[in-house]
């Protein structure tokens, strides 16, 4: 019997599960919990028990930047892994649909990263009796021994990161929009870390509660130690040796062997994938910078660069103790499919974090600003997850059977994470209780126990966040809890669907199941699940299909339940929704299945068994994506069974053929190499003792090479076989040829590459020119072999090590690099040109072959790399950089609205998908038609939040923003529970307030109070559209004011730093239009006491004022404000500011001929804005000087204020009252003696009083007094004051003469009828310049005061006579006196005229402003 030995390392994909070192609680005892229990994790702040300092961090070197343009990274391309390995600079990023993932926000991600980097390691004791629980998963295959872990992700996922666009890689990860979990960019993206926090409450099925009170900040759960892992592997090895009669040895992979082989600048020494770096072109990736301003219309979704320490540093935990061993997952050794983890993009998830097996779903909060850099620097010092190397030897069949058993029954577990609202699963906890003391709702506890019993999975509830994301002003997002499902692959898949159904039931939906053959599920769903989405849209339901891989990894349920459980679960489809919708959806599914089942066809295809095992373990998400994209089902053999046939089921030949082609293309990434050892000289009569190697000598070499490279290394009959990815195979061959034992032999190296048949002519060239050139240049032999109907094999062999590797590299340069994209068929003829001249010129220019597919060809192919792609470009890999240039040239002839069709993903919480697809389907279809795009929702069973939008690049962001407008936004704030609060909430006034908020601000308020226990907190949930988020503080303040007025306690509002804003530049708008504060502070510099008054008012406003002061920040208004005293004369008047006239001259603001300043309306001062520039007027003692004599043109006849005098003082100028002289509307003015007579509008508006005449308390009140909506409107609405003035004219209080029908006298004379309104005004006083200037103002003499009193009495008598006239209206109505004003009508306004509507007011304002400009 030939001796066959193989050595391989598991898990290939690091991070699928974890086993952490043993730790003890503060008492030194080991805590335990029932193995059938699910637990509640709640991070608790406190001292670190048993903490130790992390190893010294070393900074990670920066990779070189890529020279490629940014747009090159967004192309959809299909490059063989060998091509990518040879051209690292040509492959810098992922397609857009894989890059764009939701983050909660850049601020939150930075805060999470800071906490993650600053946290210290804690040793916690695992639960001894609990089942093995995974901690973290990662998706790509690569060895754990990295010289520089910061470069770990550079070569991780060569082929998967730049996979074709069919894949949904990176869309299955264990987090969602509100979570902080890990995101993997690989197709094998595994779920994020799980486990039981050291401070956790664990309950079993019997509802017994046990608490572990170990203090640990990161909240990493330890359910089994590394010692238990080793014991489990030891038991597995013993069972295999007993059952399969072969020798099995295993050893933990050492963590320091990588130092033997130094890394290259761009890759670590033993790359698991091609050696291109996703970090190279990070600065040119075509998505917004998360740290800067985003060009996307939905900026709250900051795209995260994938696989880079900077972008995912929030999930790094550099402080992990060196002794803590983190394992990796396995049933796919990647387990990405097992988890929702790759489905939901995290706010702070990390690809690298999953690679090192860390959980990012931790409470990450830290104030340290340098935490992100520290976390990146400390990445290189982080311990690697444990890997185990298995060495099997014996007969071929026995060894292969043992290998399959190890792949299926390894002790590594899978993890899936679902983010749910905290209120759905937890009771409202009292305010004083710590998070770990929160209790799970009894019905939720019972249902989760039932799921555990039925599936064998372990369910953990974990508080990933103590608080929601801070929205400011005491508001936060909804608090989230993680439901972590861990166990074997099939257990996790089944339990996840059941948990999702339970969550829908908690939300009040009805659920039902229906039985349909599992092979029909994807066929019923259609391409990209279009049929299922249509059913969900019409019925308003959620349809959960089971996993397509049940039974592939070896069923643990089958062994426990006589093999019946898997068959039962494979066929179950869960439907949730409203009762009648569920019934309709069930009937429609049965109807479609009956129709589809009549036309099912299948086809078999052959693939090498090791390639099948690799795809099932490392490319599970790629396979899932292929099936969903094509609407087919692929029956894979049992993992490790050495079966080489797959069966593809579908309802259309095109879909089946495209599925097989895609799988075959995926298999081309896996290489096989062989190293044949030949003796130096062979003598048949005297055989050399060294002709054959002793298997005992080979075993250490196999282990070393397998550990170093990550490939599977086999030795049989003096021949080494290496199986793995291209970079792994290259590394392994180089390592073997360096061994001293091998150098004593002659050898022949052979590389076997698999390629699609359609590329056979492309790679050979004309008359095999390309192949002959490589063979002649490198001295190698290249041979083509037929393999199957879809692929062929290329053998590259030679006896010289350097020649063979060089020949392989040159051949890789000739391998095809493809890129496909979508161009509307209407443009095909225009691009191709007459006789193909246009496209031939482009092809010749860039050396790229292009093919356009019309509708018939497209239907026959089913699309290229993506379902919608109808143009494909192909060129040798050495010319791959020109693919993007060719695409740009082709797209120049396409209209912007139709060019660059791409796929973007928008993160929308999973719970809104059913409503959006059902109730709001009409809006979605409208968005699709307006933007020429299509919206696809993810499969419900994946619990993904990523909604895909496919459309032109110029329109897709508009479509995303329009879609987000229909997504509700939820925020909440809390208040201490009390009897008064309960009474206030249940009162009719609160219902009226809620109705008013909903009507005025479009915000729905839902209070939640726990009535079953004393104390606790009341939660006020505010639900609104994203466009109304500016009104959140207003609604919160209204609710809190309502509670305060009813003696209910509330939490103090957090003090916030002031930020620059332009909000107070628009105080005249009501806050229903623009959310502004009632009164903005003054930006003026008061003199002495005035400055102190302003400072006191500002401090009082910050500390006491409850309404949000959006207008209280420095703004552009400061540029236009008036001098400190705010007393302005009209044109030709000197400024009386209590100082020199230079104050007014230096101010950028001058009096306006348009309208009075709106800023004076709500303060104790007034100011004018936006006036035409005028020259300063020098005061003169001449009493009869006219404006023309002073160097100023005289005002036009009829100009408002032309014949008015200043009321600033007695005599010719002023009567103690400031009369605005700007054009437009004259605000009310009253003599000072009338201020004690009664309430006036001008008093309320503080138009006549400055701050200098007020006490300190009055000044503060004046600054803080909010203005009413009516006064705000008066600030802007000139027509409103015009109507009041018209009323004055109609009442007769302002006389209208025949020569001046509008109450305006000629220039230089007093206006008729004005003497009764302004005491102290005489004909001589009506002239400009008459009397002392403002800055020479003298107090009134006793004679002047007596004269003013007499005139005032005469005025009162005249008013009484007018009020006694019949038809006057309301005789006792208070009269407000306005200065005369021009009217746009030639007739006097009628009496008792109501104010016109707002549109009329706007028109009046516009006309008045135009007239003023015309006259100027």
Curated annotation (Swiss-Prot):
**Knockout or disruption consequences:** Affects cell growth, pheromone response, filamentation, cell morphology, as well as pathogenicity. Leads to increased levels of mRNAs containing the AUACCC sequence.
Positions with biased composition (Polar residues): 357-369, 1219-1239, 1391-1402
Say if the entry is tagged with keyword RNA-binding.
yes
* Gene3D superfamilies assigned: K Homology domain, type 1 (3.30.1370.10)
Keyword Transit peptide attached: no
Q: What keywords does the record list, in alphabetical order?
A: Repeat, RNA-binding, Virulence
Q: Where is the KH domain?
A: 412-504, 508-594, 747-816, 817-892, 900-968
* Bias (Low complexity) ranges: 196-213, 273-285, 341-350, 1343-1374
Q: Which domain of life is it from?
A: Eukaryota
Task: Please give the Gene Ontology molecular function terms for this protein.
Answer: mRNA binding
Q: Which InterPro entries match?
A: KH_dom, KH_dom_type_1, KH_dom_type_1_sf, KH_Mug60-KHD4
PROSITE patterns in alphabetical order: KH_TYPE_1 (PS50084)
Q: Where is this region: Disordered?
A: 25-76, 108-174, 196-225, 255-320, 341-385, 1215-1240, 1289-1416
Per its UniProt record, what SUPFAM superfamilies does this chain match?
Answer: Eukaryotic type KH-domain (KH-domain type I) (SSF54791)
From the record, give the transmembrane residue ranges.
none
Q: Give me the Gene Ontology terms describing cellular component.
A: cytoplasm
Entry remark concerning the domains of this protein:
The tandem KH domains 3 and 4 are essential for AUACCC binding.
- PANTHER family given in the database record: KH DOMAIN-CONTAINING PROTEIN YLL032C (PTHR10627:SF76), SCP160 (PTHR10627)
Q: What does this protein do?
A: RNA-binding protein that recognizes the sequence AUACCC via its tandem KH domains 3 and 4, probably in order to promote mRNA instability. Plays an essential role in filamentous growth and virulence.
Stated name of the protein: K homology domain-containing protein 4
Recorded source organism is Mycosarcoma maydis (Corn smut fungus)
- Source taxonomy lineage? Eukaryota, Fungi, Dikarya, Basidiomycota, Ustilaginomycotina
């Amino acid at each position: 019997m030939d001796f066959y030995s193989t050595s391989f390392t598991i898990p290939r994909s690091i991070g699928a599960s974890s086993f952490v070192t043993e730790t003890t609680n503060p008492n030194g005892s080991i805590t335990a919990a029932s193995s059938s229990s699910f637990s509640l994790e709640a991070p608790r702040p406190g001292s670190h028990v048993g903490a130790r300092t992390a190893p010294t961090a070393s900074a990670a070197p920066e990779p070189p930047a890529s020279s490629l343009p940014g747009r090159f990274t967004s192309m959809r391309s299909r490059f063989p892994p060998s091509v990518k390995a040879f051209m690292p600079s040509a492959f810098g990023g992922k397609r857009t649909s894989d890059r764009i993932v939701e983050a909660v926000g850049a601020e939150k991600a930075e805060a999470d990263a800071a906490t993650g980097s600053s946290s210290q390691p804690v040793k916690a004791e695992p639960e001894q009796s609990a089942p093995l629980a995974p901690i973290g998963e990662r998706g790509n295959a690569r060895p754990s021994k990295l010289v520089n872990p910061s470069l770990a992700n550079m070569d991780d996922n060569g082929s998967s990161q730049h996979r074709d666009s069919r894949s949904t890689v990176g869309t299955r990860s264990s987090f969602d929009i509100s979570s902080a979990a890990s995101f993997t960019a690989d197709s094998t993206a595994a779920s994020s870390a799980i486990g039981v926090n050291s401070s956790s409450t664990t309950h079993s099925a019997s509802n017994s509660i046990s608490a572990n009170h170990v203090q640990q900040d990161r909240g990493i759960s330890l359910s089994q130690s590394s010692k238990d892992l080793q014991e489990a592997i030891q038991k597995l090895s013993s069972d295999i040796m007993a059952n399969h009669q072969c020798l099995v040895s295993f050893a933990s992979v050492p963590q320091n062997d990588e130092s033997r082989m130094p890394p290259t600048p761009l890759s670590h020494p033993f790359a698991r994938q091609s050696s291109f770096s996703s970090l190279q072109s990070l600065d040119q990736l075509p998505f917004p910078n998360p740290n800067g301003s985003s060009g996307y219309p939905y900026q709250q979704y900051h795209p995260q660069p994938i696989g880079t320490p900077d972008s995912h540093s929030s999930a790094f935990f550099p402080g992990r103790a060196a002794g803590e061993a983190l394992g990796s997952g396995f049933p796919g050794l990647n387990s990405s499919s097992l988890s929702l983890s790759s489905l939901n993009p995290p706010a702070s998830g990390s690809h690298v974090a999953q690679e090192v097996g860390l959980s990012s779903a931790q409470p990450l909060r830290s104030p340290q600003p340098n935490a992100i850099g520290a976390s990146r620097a400390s990445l290189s010092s982080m311990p690697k997850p444990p890997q185990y190397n298995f060495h099997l030897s014996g007969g071929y069949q026995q060894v292969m059977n043992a290998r399959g058993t190890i792949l299926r029954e390894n002790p590594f577990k899978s993890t899936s994470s679902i983010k749910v609202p905290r209120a759905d699963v937890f009771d409202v906890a009292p305010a004083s209780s710590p998070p770990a003391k929160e209790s799970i709702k009894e019905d939720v506890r019972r249902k989760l126990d039932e799921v555990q019993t039925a599936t064998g999975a372990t369910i953990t509830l974990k508080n990933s966040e103590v608080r929601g994301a801070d929205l400011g002003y005491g508001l936060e997002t909804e608090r989230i809890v993680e439901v972590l499902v861990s166990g074997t692959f099939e257990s996790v898949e089944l339990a996840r669907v059941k948990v999702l159904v339970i969550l829908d039931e908690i939300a009040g939906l009805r659920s039902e199941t229906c039985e349909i053959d599992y092979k029909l599920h994807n066929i019923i769903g259609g391409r990209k699940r279009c049929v299922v989405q249509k059913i969900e849209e019409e019925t308003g339901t959620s349809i959960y299909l089971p996993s397509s891989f049940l039974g592939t990894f070896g069923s643990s349920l089958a062994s426990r339940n006589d093999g019946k459980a898997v068959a039962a679960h494979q066929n179950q489809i869960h439907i949730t929704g409203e009762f009648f919708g569920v019934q309709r959806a069930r009937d429609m599914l049965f109807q479609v299945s009956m129709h589809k089942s009549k036309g099912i066809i299948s086809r078999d295809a052959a693939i090498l068994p090791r390639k099948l095992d690799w795809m099932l373990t490392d490319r599970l998400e790629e396979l899932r994506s292929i099936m969903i994209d094509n609407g087919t089902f692929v029956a894979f053999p049992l993992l490790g069974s050495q079966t080489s046939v797959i069966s593809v089921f579908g309802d259309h030949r095109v879909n089946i053929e495209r599925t097989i082609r895609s799988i075959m293309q995926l298999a081309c990434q896996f290489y096989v190499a062989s190293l044949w050892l030949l003796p130096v000289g062979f003598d048949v009569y005297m055989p050399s003792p060294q002709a054959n190697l002793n298997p005992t000598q080979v075993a250490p070499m196999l282990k070393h090479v397998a550990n170093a490279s990550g490939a599977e290394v086999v030795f049989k009959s003096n021949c080494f076989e290496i199986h793995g990815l291209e970079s792994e195979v290259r590394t392994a061959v180089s390592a073997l040829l360096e061994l001293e034992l091998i150098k004593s032999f002659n050898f022949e190296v052979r590389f076997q590459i698999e390629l699609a048949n359609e590329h056979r002519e492309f790679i050979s060239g004309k008359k095999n020119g390309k192949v002959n050139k490589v063979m002649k240049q490198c001295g190698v032999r290249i041979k083509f072999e037929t393999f199957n109907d879809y692929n062929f094999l290329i053998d590259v062999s030679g006896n010289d090590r350097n020649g063979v590797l060089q020949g392989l590299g040159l051949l890789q340069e000739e391998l095809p690099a493809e890129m496909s994209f979508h161009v509307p068929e209407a443009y095909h003829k225009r691009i191709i040109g007459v006789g193909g001249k246009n496209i031939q010129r482009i092809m010749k220019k860039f050396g790229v072959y292009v093919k356009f597919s019309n509708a018939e060809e497209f239907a026959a192919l089913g699309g290229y790399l993506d379902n919608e792609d109808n143009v494909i470009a192909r060129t040798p890999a050495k010319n791959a950089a020109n693919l993007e240039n060719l695409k740009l040239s082709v797209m120049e002839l396409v209209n912007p609205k139709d060019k660059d069709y791409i796929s973007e993903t928008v993160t929308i919480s999973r719970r809104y998908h059913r409503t959006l697809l059902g109730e709001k389907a009409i809006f979605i279809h409208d968005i699709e038609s307006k933007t020429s795009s299509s919206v696809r929702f993810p499969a419900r069973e994946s619990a993904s939040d990523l909604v895909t939008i496919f459309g032109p690049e110029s329109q897709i962001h508009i479509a995303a923003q329009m879609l987000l407008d229909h997504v509700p936004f939820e925020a909440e704030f809390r208040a201490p529970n009390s009897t008064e609060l309960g009474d206030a909430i249940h009162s009719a006034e609160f219902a009226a307030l809620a109705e008013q908020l909903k009507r005025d601000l479009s915000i729905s308020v839902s209070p939640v109070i726990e009535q079953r226990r004393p104390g606790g907190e009341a939660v006020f949930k505010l639900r609104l559209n994203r466009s109304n988020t500016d009104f959140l503080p207003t609604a919160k303040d209204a609710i809190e004011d309502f509670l305060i007025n009813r003696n209910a306690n509330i939490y103090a509002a957090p003090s916030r730093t002031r930020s620059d804003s332009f909000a107070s530049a628009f105080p005249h708008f009501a806050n229903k239009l623009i959310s502004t504060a009632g009164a903005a502070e003054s930006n003026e510099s008061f003199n002495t006491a005035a400055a102190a008054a302003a400072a006191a008012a500002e401090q009082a406003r910050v500390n006491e004022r409850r309404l949000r002061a959006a207008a209280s920040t420095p703004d552009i208004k400061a540029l236009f404000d008036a001098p400190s005293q705010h007393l302005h004369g009209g044109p030709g008047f000197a400024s009386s500011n209590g100082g020199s006239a230079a104050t007014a001259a230096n101010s950028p603001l001058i009096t306006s001929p348009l309208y009075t300043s709106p800023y004076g309306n709500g303060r104790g001062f007034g100011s004018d804005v936006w006036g035409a520039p005028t020259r300063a007027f020098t005061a003169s003692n001449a009493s009869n000087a006219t404006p023309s004599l002073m160097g100023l043109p005289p005002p036009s006849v009829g100009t408002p204020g032309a014949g008015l005098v200043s009321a600033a003082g007695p005599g010719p100028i002023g009567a103690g009252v400031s009369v605005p002289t700007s054009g437009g509307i004259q605000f009310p003015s009253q003599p000072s003696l009338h201020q004690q007579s009664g309430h006036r509008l001008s008093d309320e508006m503080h138009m006549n009083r400055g701050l200098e005449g007020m006490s300190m308390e009055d000044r503060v009140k004046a600054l803080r007094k909010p203005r009413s909506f009516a006064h705000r409107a008066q600030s802007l609405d000139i027509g409103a004051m015009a109507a009041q003035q018209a009323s004055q004219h109609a009442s007769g209080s302002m006389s209208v003469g025949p020569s001046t029908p509008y109450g305006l006298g000629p220039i230089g004379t007093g206006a008729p009828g004005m003497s009764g309104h302004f005491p102290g005004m005489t004909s001589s006083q009506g002239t400009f310049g008459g009397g002392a200037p403002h800055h020479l103002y003298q107090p009134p003499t006793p004679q002047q005061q007596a004269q003013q009193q007499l005139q005032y009495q005469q005025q009162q008598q005249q008013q009484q006579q007018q009020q006694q006239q019949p038809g006057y209206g309301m005789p006792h109505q208070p009269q407000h006196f306005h200065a005369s004003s021009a009217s746009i009508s030639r007739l006097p306004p009628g009496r008792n005229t109501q104010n016109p509507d707002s549109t009329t007011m706007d028109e009046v304002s516009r006309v008045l402003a135009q007239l003023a400009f015309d006259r100027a």
